[in-house]
């Protein structure tokens, strides 16, 4: 049993660097290399979607020098890796609140998405300047605007309709969430979409995450009985 959609909270870059007496940015550089390896590995498996939590809205409260470095690293990674993603038939999508991005970042995101949008292999989702609460709020705001313009009535509102206004509404919800670094929390990531997601916590810091760790998470998923509110007996039928 392989999950259709795997999401990963890539945590631990800073701690990885600190344990080695290195600046935090060294951890982020090491983490970026792991992203490339794991995407390549995931693309070889029968996964449909891989979503990576790269930068949260709350991360903007970090020291400005670190935020600037991360934005530069993301931009550079997009420039360097888009052609390789395209060659591997990977479709790239970047989700999140993009109002904080400069023109260079916005242009590169558009270029990368346009180049890969017709690819039929792994769908790679990068959550950049994203948070689960923001996602829910923007969905509410869009629905409220439709009601205001008389394009929608409150009587028609439902969980199913609301879900259509969230990011990734056209994709299956995550079956498996992997959280690295030993922390055990969602960190405001895809709060609506994780309603029935299986969660795997690994002590591995993100720069130490590898193909074996990924396979361990997939093995954990295969042990789970997904019930979606039903009894075990109902599921077994």
Curated annotation (Swiss-Prot):
InterPro entries found in the cross-reference section: UPP_synth-like (IPR001441), UPP_synth-like_CS (IPR018520), UPP_synth-like_sf (IPR036424)
GO MF: ditrans,polycis-undecaprenyl-diphosphate synthase [(2E,6E)-farnesyl-diphosphate specific] activity; magnesium ion binding
Free-text cofactor note: Binds 2 magnesium ions per subunit.
Highest taxon listed in the record's lineage: Bacteria
PROSITE patterns per UniProt: UPP_SYNTHASE
Catalytic reaction list: 8 isopentenyl diphosphate + (2E,6E)-farnesyl diphosphate = di-trans,octa-cis-undecaprenyl diphosphate + 8 diphosphate
UniProt keyword annotations, A-Z: Cell shape, Cell wall biogenesis/degradation, Magnesium, Metal-binding, Peptidoglycan synthesis, Transferase
Coiled coil stretches, renumbered: none
GO biological process: cell wall organization; peptidoglycan biosynthetic process; polyprenol biosynthetic process; regulation of cell shape
Pfam families to which the protein is assigned, alphabetical: Prenyltransf
Active-site residues per Swiss-Prot or TrEMBL entry: 11, 59 (proton acceptor)
Cellular component per GO, a single term: cytosol
Binding site for Mg(2+): 11, 198
Role of this protein: Catalyzes the sequential condensation of isopentenyl diphosphate (IPP) with (2E,6E)-farnesyl diphosphate (E,E-FPP) to yield (2Z,6Z,10Z,14Z,18Z,22Z,26Z,30Z,34E,38E)-undecaprenyl diphosphate (di-trans,octa-cis-UPP). UPP is the precursor of glycosyl carrier lipid in the biosynthesis of bacterial cell wall polysaccharide components such as peptidoglycan and lipopolysaccharide.
Complex and partners: Homodimer.
Entry protein name: Ditrans,polycis-undecaprenyl-diphosphate synthase ((2E,6E)-farnesyl-diphosphate specific)
Organism: Coxiella burnetii (strain RSA 493 / Nine Mile phase I)
Lineage: Bacteria, Pseudomonadati, Pseudomonadota, Gammaproteobacteria, Legionellales
Protein's gene: uppS
């Amino acid at each position: 049993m392989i999950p259709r959609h795997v999401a990963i909270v890539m945590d631990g870059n800073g701690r990885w660097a600190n344990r080695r007496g290195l600046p935090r940015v060294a951890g982020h550089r090491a983490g970026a290399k792991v992203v490339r390896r794991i995407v390549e590995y995931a693309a070889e498996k029968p996964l449909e979607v891989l979503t990576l939590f790269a930068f949260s809205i709350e991360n903007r409260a970090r020291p400005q020098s670190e935020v600037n470095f991360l934005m530069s690293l993301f931009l550079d990674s997009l420039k360097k890796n888009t052609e390789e993603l395209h060659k591997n038939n990977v479709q790239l999508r970047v989700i999140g609140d993009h109002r904080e991005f400069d023109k260079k970042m916005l242009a590169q995101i558009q270029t990368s998405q346009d180049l890969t949008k017709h690819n039929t292999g792994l769908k790679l989702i990068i959550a950049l300047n994203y948070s689960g609460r923001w996602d829910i709020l923007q969905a509410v705001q869009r629905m409220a605007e439709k009601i205001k313009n008389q394009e929608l009535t409150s009587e028609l509102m439902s969980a199913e309709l609301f879900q259509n206004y969230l990011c990734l509404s056209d994709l299956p919800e995550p079956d498996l969430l992997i959280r690295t670094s030993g922390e055990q929390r969602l960190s405001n990531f895809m709060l609506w979409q994780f309603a029935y997601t299986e969660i795997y916590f690994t002590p591995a810091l993100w720069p130490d995450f590898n193909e074996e760790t990924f396979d361990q998470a997939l093995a954990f998923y295969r042990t789970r009985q997904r019930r979606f509110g039903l009894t075990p007996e109902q599921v077994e039928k």
